[in-house]
């Protein structure tokens, strides 16, 4: 499935957010030309992961070096912009304008261009426009780092560049939507994608609640979104090798908690007595006592044992794994097959696109 075949994308992005956006476009069939600075290129080429990480984010693209500080380089880039369908960058706002490649410059020679600017704070709001940003900086600025962890504790950032990734996904989504609209209107479009906007999308439900009530979200640690007393991470007994474990349980409703009680050997009717109805998600009449009793009971078996028993009973549950452990297990059961990507002479195994589409048994192909 290559729905973007024939789409020409000029890519002035680097690091994660922008390259991920154009990676998705390339994997969906677009012809992506990635412009890098001479003498080093994208900073990811020289980081600890080296060529493998760069390949994972840039497979399927044609990479060229252009010096945007030279008149010849700017002229070459402008000529490429004249013939592209989409131009995307994630430099600090103003960088391409200084090179004569801003939205108005490109629009003047290519009225139908979809011009996507990806930045920390957006390009349309003067007070914030010049600000630089990285993933962890945006997590701090938007309050994301104050959603994790426990009340009264230090800030806790998400352990991977979640904002960068979401920004890339949103940029690819926005560009695809703008391309579709252009087919109807024949007009180009300036698409402005900010990292703070992506952060609010990740915190969508919490953001809506703040707008509706003005209340600052509570820090919930490892508790589930539902607020159910049985939706949390709990310590379990050590496994056969003596390794301690944790079990994540998602018993959000009274009915699910009744099933949990059955697995524990408790009377399901007891759940009715200890829980309050009428809240949507389950609420305990005495939350502290409820959790203490449940936590104590879950220490009787290993996390693996609880996972199997609870899932069999219809209660969402999973033992705590690290990423490598999960990927090995997913491959072992045939649920996950790594996708091999190649860029130049480097081949790297990746998780693919995160989805499959198989009309008539034909899987999506990746470059």
Description of each model-found segment:
Residues 1-184, 341:
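N-terminal helix-loop segment corresponding to the beta1-alpha1 unit
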Residues 54, 218-226, 232, 249, ...:
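Short Gly/Pro-enriched turn/cap motifs at secondary-structure boundaries
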Residues 123-124, 152-160, 183-199, 219-224, ...:
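Conserved Rossmann-fold dehydrogenase catalytic segment
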Residues 153-163, 238-245, 360-363:
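Flexible glycine/proline-enriched surface loops and loop-helix/loop-strand junctions
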Residues 168-188, 202-212, 261-272:
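Oxidoreductase and adenylate-handling cofactor-binding alpha/beta cores
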Residues 230-313, 317:
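Aromatic-enriched alpha-helical interface/lid elements that frame and gate functional surfaces
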Residues 311-334:
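Conserved PLP cofactor-binding pocket of PLP-dependent enzymes
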Residues 340-367:
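Flexible, small-/acidic-enriched active-site or ligand-binding loops
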């Amino acid at each position: 499935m290559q729905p973007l075949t024939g789409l020409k994308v000029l890519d002035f992005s680097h690091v994660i957010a922008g390259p991920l956006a154009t990676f998705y476009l390339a994997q969906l069939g677009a012809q992506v030309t990635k412009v890098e600075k001479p003498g080093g290129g994208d900073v990811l080429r020289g980081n600890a992961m080296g060529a493998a990480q760069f390949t994972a984010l840039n497979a399927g693209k044609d990479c060229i070096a252009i010096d945007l500080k030279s008149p010849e380089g700017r002229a070459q880039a402008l000529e490429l912009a004249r013939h592209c369908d989409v131009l995307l960058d994630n430099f600090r706002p103003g960088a391409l304008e200084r090179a004569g490649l801003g939205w108005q410059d490109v629009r003047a020679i290519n009225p139908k261009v979809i011009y996507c600017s990806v930045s920390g704070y957006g390009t349309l709001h003067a007070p914030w426009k010049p600000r630089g940003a990285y993933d962890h900086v945006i997590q701090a600025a938007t309050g994301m780092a104050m959603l994790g962890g426990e009340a009264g504790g230090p800030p806790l950032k998400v352990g991977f560049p979640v904002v960068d990734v979401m920004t890339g996904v949103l940029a690819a989504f926005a560009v695809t939507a703008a391309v579709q609209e252009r087919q109807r209107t024949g007009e180009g479009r300036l698409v402005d994608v900010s990292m703070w906007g992506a952060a609010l999308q990740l915190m969508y439900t919490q953001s809506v609640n703040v707008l509706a009530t003005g209340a600052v979200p509570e820090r919930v640690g490892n508790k589930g979104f539902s607020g159910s007393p049985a939706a949390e991470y709990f310590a379990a007994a050590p496994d056969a090798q003596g390794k301690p474990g944790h079990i994540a349980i998602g018993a959000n409703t009274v009915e699910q908690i009744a099933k949990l009680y059955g697995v524990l050997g408790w009377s399901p009717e007891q759940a009715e007595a200890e829980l309050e109805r009428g809240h949507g998600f389950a609420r305990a009449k005495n939350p502290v006592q409820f959790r203490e009793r449940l936590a104590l009971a879950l220490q009787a078996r290993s996390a693996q044992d609880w996972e199997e028993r609870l899932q069999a009973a219809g209660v969402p549950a999973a033992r705590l794994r690290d990423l490598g452990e999960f990927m090995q297990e997913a491959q072992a059961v045939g649920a996950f097959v790594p996708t091999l990507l190649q860029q130049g002479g480097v081949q790297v195994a990746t998780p693919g696109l995160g989805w499959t589409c198989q009309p008539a048994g034909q899987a999506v192909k990746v470059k």
